[in-house]
């Protein structure tokens, strides 16, 4: 049976922020961290972050208070950004950008209210 260590950090300097890390790699790097904010009547998930075993961030989601507007970012294990996308009212809205492993911009897709309007490729 595997036992997972929970790391809980309260920071009163940041208006009642709670960070939970339910699982760790063998090298004590957290596999993920969930950041919550306590308001007067509820606890809201503000950010979820996943990590590679080397400690490099692999995925991050930033949420607003209702959870329908968010920004998602992915990274390669070398630290270069892989993808970035934003959501508004639960639908893709804005620019969905992808990069190659070497950091070169690969593609941009332009969305409004969940519908793709156009696409721009940067590959040669």
Predicted features along the sequence, with ranges:
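Glycine/tyrosine- and acidic-biased, solvent-exposed loop/turn segments at the edges of beta-strands
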Residues: 14-124
């Amino acid at each position: 049976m595997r036992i997972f260590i929970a790391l809980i950090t309260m920071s009163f300097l940041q208006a009642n922020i709670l960070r939970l890390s339910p699982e760790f790699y063998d090298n004590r790097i957290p596999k993920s961290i969930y950041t919550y904010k306590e308001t007067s009547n509820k606890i809201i998930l503000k950010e979820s972050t996943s990590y590679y075993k080397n400690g490099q961030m692999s995925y991050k989601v930033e949420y607003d208070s209702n959870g329908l507007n968010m920004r998602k970012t992915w990274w390669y294990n070398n630290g270069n950004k892989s993808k970035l996308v934003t959501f508004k009212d639960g639908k893709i809205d804005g620019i969905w950008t992808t990069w190659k492993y070497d950091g070169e911009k690969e593609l941009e897709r332009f969305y409004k209210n969940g519908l793709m309007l156009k696409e721009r490729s940067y590959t040669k």
